[in-house]
Amino acid sequence: MNRKDEHVSLAKAFHSKQKNEFDTVRIVHNPLPEVSMSEIDLHTTVAGLTLDYPLYINAMTGGSEKTKKINHDLAMIAKETNLMIATGSVSAALKDSALSDSYTIMRDVYPEGKILANVGAGTSLARAKEAIELFQADALQLHLNAPQELVMPEGDRDFSNWKELIKEISEGISVPLIVKEVGFGMTRETIDELAELGVQTIDISGRSGTSFTQIENARRKKRELDYLVDWGQSTVTSLLEANEAQHQV
């Protein structure tokens, strides 16, 4: 089975309503709101892109015929709701152009939409530009996924040049850059480091959704790394970590 299809199959198998730390968060009530509902405007800006509301469809999949259908359907949803959307990692298409249409289908379906390309942090500037040009992406997501790579049987084991590559991409592309986590959360120290590299937009996606350590461990013959299934910080913890760095990014 294609690895991308395997990821989707396992994500479905492991999908469940997990406990979420947002359930423990209580919003402080304001007894004196002094606002009219007609004055409320949900428009916001992410990475210089204006959105109708603070919501978008994040990176999921691509790289096979089955995932092409998923991306087609996601793009249809994005078009009908006027949402920004990101492709899954386009690394498969950069290695094999025959797989490109599983990503470009999003632009075919949603030509006027805001669509983000997605590549890993170990990607060169030249490859990053290829990813952007593949379907004229409006911005580039650069994902950090070291835990996934370490658990993945065929994953990368060398992350020593990530910061160098991130800086090159930050300085060398003509569209906005978003550095994102893939469900392991973010720390204040990492946010500080990324800001020093010129990164202005950071997606702090934390634990409680799809677990790529769980998915990759299920692909291992012995499944011996199950203790890493819940690795990382939650999004709530990551938000607290990010709070002190708001002035930087």
Over which residues does each language-model region extend?
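Active-site cofactor/substrate anionic-group-binding motifs, chiefly glycine-
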Residues: T45-A92
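A gly/proline- and charged-residue-enriched helix-loop-helix capping module
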Residues: N82-V119
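Alpha/beta enzyme core
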Residues: A75-E80, P111-L116, A121-V249
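Secondary-structure boundary/capping motif
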Residues: K66-T67, L94-A98, M186
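"Short basic amphipathic alpha-helical interaction patches in structured regions
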Residues: K69-A75, L99-S102, A131
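Short alpha-helical segments and helix-capping/turn motifs at coil-helix boundaries
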Residues: D41-H43, D101, S124-A128
